[in-house]
């Protein structure tokens, strides 16, 4: 967002997502934030919930949850049976990504410097036939100079985030895959490699 300047400028509960080290700028004892947004004329929905609390004068703890999903996707696997088309057999499913973050930020001994990190659990679901669970860690640092410049770095998925996919199809559904020359998905492991984001902002 904003050419990555948000990584440096964020200073409230939403820092748990953008840059955990920015949580130390929170002034209130407790902050709560919620957001809902539609994409592609309502085809996809994004939801965010964040809660953060001061642990001490120098540290902050937060919990964040995000959901991004496409709902009511037609499932046409059973549309044609024995050469007959029957739209009553068309069902619907959702493809949804969930992210759960527990974040902590701490001011360093050096004035203006802070560090933060997030442990995250990622869950993805596509109907009743595909799901995955994964785990990852984000780390960040932020430095605010005396002339109001802020420099920040965010290391996403620094440990390499994994998602273990599990597929569950009935024998009838697998037969449809074979008849239509489609490959039957196999259980697999998806990896997200580390990504470093730099941001600069000025008040």
Specify the residue positions occupied by each region the protein language model found:
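Subset of outer-membrane beta-barrel
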Residues: 1-203
């Amino acid at each position: 967002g904003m050419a990555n300047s948000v990584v440096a400028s964020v200073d409230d509960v939403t820092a748990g997502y953008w840059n955990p080290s920015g949580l130390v700028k929170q002034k209130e004892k407790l902050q709560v934030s919620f957001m809902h947004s539609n994409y592609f004329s309502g085809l996809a929905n994004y939801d965010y919930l964040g809660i953060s609390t001061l642990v001490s004068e120098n540290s902050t703890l937060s919990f964040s949850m995000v959901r991004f999903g496409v709902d009511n996707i037609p499932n046409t696997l059973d549309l044609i049976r024995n050469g007959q088309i029957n739209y009553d057999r068309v069902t619907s499913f959702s493809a949804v990504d969930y992210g759960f973050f527990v974040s902590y930020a701490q001011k360093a001994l050096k004035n203006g410097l802070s560090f933060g990190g997030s442990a995250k659990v990622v869950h993805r679901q596509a109907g009743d036939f595909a799901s995955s669970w994964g785990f990852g860690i984000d780390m960040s640092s932020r430095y605010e100079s005396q002339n109001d410049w802020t420099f920040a770095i965010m290391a996403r998925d620094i440990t390499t985030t994994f998602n273990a996919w599990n597929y569950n199809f009935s024998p009838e559904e697998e037969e449809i895959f074979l008849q239509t020359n489609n490959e039957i998905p196999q259980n697999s492991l998806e990896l997200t490699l580390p990504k470093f984001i730099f941001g600069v902002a000025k008040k």
